[in-house]
């Protein structure tokens, strides 16, 4: 597998921007054209998830619909529109003898990505790797195995249709945890490993991997409301950031408010958040502000702990 990925990486490293973009456009089109096949596989994952009593948030991350597939396809086309990073000059200088020295961006080679059970990440990861001229080996969450299998098949077929190597996108999902362990030990075969998920997953990979790791964040997205902010707009932003899709990793998790507007803003914002079913982990100042407010369900307010800020 890694030998095939290495050969595919060599091809992609020399591919033109036009060729790579054609591959991405083919992937975007195939996601829409083969939606029924993808959704049938996703239905298998969803049924298994419900049988295993997955939480509503995790099920929402796992779920695909035709609208979500169109959004994923649109995201691929947004990557097409991005400038090609390969060959970009980062910096340069001229030596005393007139020699021009430049630092340019080049593909890494073969990238391994280990991530949670979100099918859209399969497409995001594959598309970004292709755009940057890399081959990618994927290990998605087991809950999305059926969805990922079909999505990777769709991507590989799309690349083949425009003359790019299918082995630029591969998966070790069928090997389960053994596949993830093999990726972590593939020093020299995989050039960089990127974990995406919770702190436990990321820390385990950072500690155990023999392959260089690009460490990502674990979430805890912040929103800050300054004293000069438009409070109505801020309220709308926090509602969208938290309640649009509560289960995704970029949903807002920490709200910081300037003391000058805390009294006015927090009562209104927390009223809307708790009404929408959001439990508030409040510090002492916030609890003092909202305590006894008739518009706020007291059962939805719990004391914040140190771990809430991590």
Q: Language-model segments: which ranges?
A:
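N-terminal Rossmann-like NAD(P)+-binding subdomain of aldehyde/semialdehyde dehydrogenases
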Residues: 1-100
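Short beta-strand-to-turn element immediately C-terminal to the catalytic PLP-Schiff-base lysine
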Residues: 224-227, 256-259, 290
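NAD(P)-dependent aldehyde/semialdehyde dehydrogenase
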Residues: 88, 260-310
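Rossmann-like NAD(P) dinucleotide-binding subdomain of oxidoreductase/dehydrogenase enzymes
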Residues: 81, 90-232
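Residue-level signal for inorganic ion chemistry
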Residues: 16, 20, 133, 193, ...
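Active-site PLP-lysine loop of aminotransferase-like
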Residues: 217, 238-256
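Short internal beta-strands
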Residues: 137-143, 255-258, 280-285
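Flexible, glycine/charged-enriched surface loops at secondary-structure junctions
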Residues: 15-22, 86, 162-169, 244-251, ...
